[in-house]
From Swiss-Prot:
Transfers and isomerizes the ribose moiety from AdoMet to the 7-aminomethyl group of 7-deazaguanine (preQ1-tRNA) to give epoxyqueuosine (oQ-tRNA). Keywords: Cytoplasm, Queuosine biosynthesis, S-adenosyl-L-methionine, Transferase. This is S-adenosylmethionine:tRNA ribosyltransferase-isomerase. The keyword Ribonucleoprotein does not apply. NCBIfam families: PRK00147.1 (NF001140), queA (TIGR00113). Belongs to the QueA family. It is an enzyme of class 2 (transferase). Disulfide bonds: none annotated. Pathway: tRNA modification; tRNA-queuosine biosynthesis. It comes from Zymomonas mobilis subsp. mobilis (strain ATCC 31821 / ZM4 / CP4). HAMAP family: QueA. The gene is queA. One of its GO terms (cellular component) is cytoplasm. The keyword Transferase applies. Its EC number is 2.4.99.17.
Length: 342
């Protein structure tokens, strides 16, 4: 499928650099097969039904962005994937200045050795010392903000709170499951009072979620893989909801992709603990998901193709144009949408 069919023009001023405060005050565009309506995330208890099941991703973002020096050369590195007890792959600015066995000093008594530089420009680092790498990153790292924010401003202490969901428990993500950023404990309580239940899965979001498709046809795109887990308890909750006639609504594309990866052809969800590289494009038959809450995505991205698969390309292009025209804020810190195909 031609990637340029999923392109649209987005004004720079539509990109949110900070989240809405309070979180649930973000705007929410509800899109159904019949219409589009403007709400706020705080309206969710009135938009969802008793018996619905929301799925949240409980991954925790690690402070994976590091700035350091090799001699006098400034080096910035985004850790993207763990490769061993002390080794991480990283996207590196000024990677050409690095060679095998170079030592990069990231400050705060944190340094790493260059194992090798990969053909794609990424670098494999091995962190020195005996302290767990998680402690080193917590001490010296910053939140790995998406490129479209990081190019406008550096990460700061506020991002350590803003770029983490209230469900964050299991460390491993280098990007936030951003649809869940809109939820507060108070909103969850109101949803529970309405009879809307929720459960959690884990998918450690990788930096590949921000990579543009560099091909003209989606058939030629190599999808990044991410590790995810669905417990037997969560699988049972999803299957029971479907059995009782309730709707399963994924909060975020990460939850959706994981659930669809764990479902068999009959729509039954099984416990899951593995990598997934599922790539959902128009024509895909959804096995489980009845709806999706998700932020607004980049043009020509795998995630815009995913929402187009759920709702239809023309409808999503029209919805995004409405969002742009009426001042919705886009991307990770932006507003959200509730997509209900039936």
């Amino acid at each position: 499928m031609r990637v340029d069919l999923f392109d649209f023009e987005l004004p720079t001023e539509s990109i949110a650099l900070r989240p809405a405060v309070p979180r649930e005050s973000a705007r929410l565009l509800q899109v159904t097969s019949q219409e589009m309506d403007d709400y706020h995330v705080a309206d969710l208890p009135n938009l969802l039904q008793e018996g619905d099941l929301l799925i949240f991703n409980d991954t925790r973002v690690i402070p994976a962005y590091l700035e350091g020096k090799k001699n006098q050369a400034r080096i910035s590195a985004n850790m993207i994937k763990r490769e061993g007890l002390r080794q991480w792959q990283a996207f590196v600015r000024n990677a050409k200045r690095l060679k095998s066995d170079d030592i990069v000093d990231f400050g705060q008594d944190v340094s790493a050795r260059v194992v090798h530089r990969n053909d794609d420009g990424s670098v494999l680092f091995e962190f020195l010392g005996n302290e767990p790498v998680e402690i080193l990153l917590e001490r010296a790292g910053n939140m790995p903000l998406p490129p479209y924010i990081a190019h406008k401003r550096p990460a700061d202490q506020q991002d350590r709170q803003d770029y983490q969901t209230i469900f964050a428990e299991k460390e491993g993500a280098v990007a936030a499951p951003t649809a869940s950023l809109h939820f507060t404990e108070e909103l969850l309580q109101r949803l529970e009072e309405k009879g809307v239940k929720h459960t959690k899965v884990t998918l450690h979001v990788g930096a590949g979620t921000f990579l543009p498709m560099k091909v003209e046809d989606s058939d030629d795109h190599v999808m990044h893989s991410e590790w995810g887990q669905i417990s037997a308890e969560t699988a049972n909750a999803i299957n029971e909801t479907k059995k009782q006639g309730g709707r399963v609504i994924a909060t975020g594309t990460t939850s959706l992709r994981l659930i669809e990866s764990a479902a068999d052809e009959t729509g039954l969800v099984h416990p899951f603990s593995d990598e997934t590289d599922i790539f959902i494009t128009p024509g895909y038959r959804f096995r489980v998901i009845d709806g999706l809450m998700t932020n607004f995505h980049l043009p020509k991205s795998t995630l815009f193709m995913l929402v187009s698969a759920l709702m239809g390309r023309e409808k999503m292009l029209a919805a995004y144009q409405h969002a742009i025209d009426t001042g919705y804020r886009f991307y990770s810190y932006g507003d959200s949408s509730l997509l209900l195909p039936k």
